[in-house]
Amino acid sequence: MSAVPGVLAVAGDLVEDVVAHTSEPLRMGSDAAATITRQRGGSAANVAVFAAAVGAPTRFVGCVGPDAAGDGVVAELTAKGVDVRVQRRGSTGTIVVVVDDSGERTMLPDRAACALLGTVDDAWLAGVEILHLPLYGFDTGTTPDALRDMATRVRAAGGRVSIDISSTRLVDVHGPAWVDALVADLLPTWVSANADEVTALGLDGDDWLARHPFATVLARAGARATRVLRHGDPTVTVPVQPVEGARDTTGAGDAFAAGFLSATLRGEPVETAVVAGHALAARVICATGAELA
C-alpha cells in the first residue's frame, strides 16, 4: 500500500435518505402532513461529500446494492468530487429521516448492503493519510471486520484513524464496554462525539482518557462550545458561533468531522480545525437534509 500522504478516506454507509419534514406532531395510528424528498445519505458518505466540497482529496469506501438506488447514490457522490470505491451486493440501504419544526431529526435506518462490505484492495487505501470511520459501520454484518482491517493497514502505512461515535443507540444496543474495546482495537487519533454520546460513555472522564491516552476526544455540544480532551493535557474549549436560520440538524456532526479533518490534512492546529468543523456544520444546519447551504 502506498504511503503517499494526502487523501482523506471515509469508510462506511452510503444509503438513500427519505427525508420527511413535518410541522405537525406525529400521531400514532394516524397521519401527519409532510414534505418528502429523496437524496444521498449515510454518515460516511456525508463526511466524504462535505470534505470534497471544501477541497480535501476525498475517497469513499463502502458497499451498495447492484440496483438503481445504488447507481444513483454512487453517481451523486462521484458528481460531488468524491473518489468512490464500492463493492456491489445485496440491496442499497435506506434511512427514513423525520424532521420536526425545530430542525431536530429522528432516523429509521435499514443498512442493508452497508453491512456487507468485505476486505478491500490495497489500491483502495493508496495514499490515505486519514481514515475516518463512523461507528454505524461496526453495528452488524461483515463490515466491522473489513473496517478493522482497513484501520490496521492504514496505521501500518503511517496514516491516522478518526472515529465518530455516531449514535447513542449503538451504546444502548452494544454497551459502553463494546465501544471501549473498539476504541482500544482501532487506536484512533481522534474520537468525535455529541453531548449525549459523551455522557453515555464518560468520554470526558479521567478514567476513560487514561485508558485511551492515544486519543483526542472532540466533545461536541450543539450550540455550546466544543471541548478538546486528551489524557494529561488541559481541556481546550472552542466556542461555537451563533447560527441564524437553522432548519435541520441532519448531517451536522458529519459536517463537523469533514471540516475538522480537512483542516487537519492542511496542517492546521487542533483549535483552528475545530473552528473549521463548526463553520461547515453551520452551513449544513441552514440547509434541508445533509446538504451545504
Label for each model-derived stretch:
Residues M1-A9, A32, R153, L203-A293:
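Conserved phosphate-binding/catalytic region of the ribokinase-like
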Residues M1-C63, A68-G72, A246:
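Glycine-rich phosphate/adenosyl-contacting loop at the front of the ribokinase-like
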Residues M1-L14, E76-Q87, V99-T235:
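Ribokinase/PfkB-type carbohydrate-kinase core domain
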Residues A44-A48, G70, L147, I163, ...:
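A general structural signal for well-ordered alpha-helical segments in protein cores
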Residues A51, N194, G253:
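Short, conserved phosphate/pyrophosphate- and ester-handling motifs at nucleotide-, phospho-/glycolipid
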Residues V61, L108, V238-P239:
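Hydrophobic residues at beta-strand termini and immediately following loops
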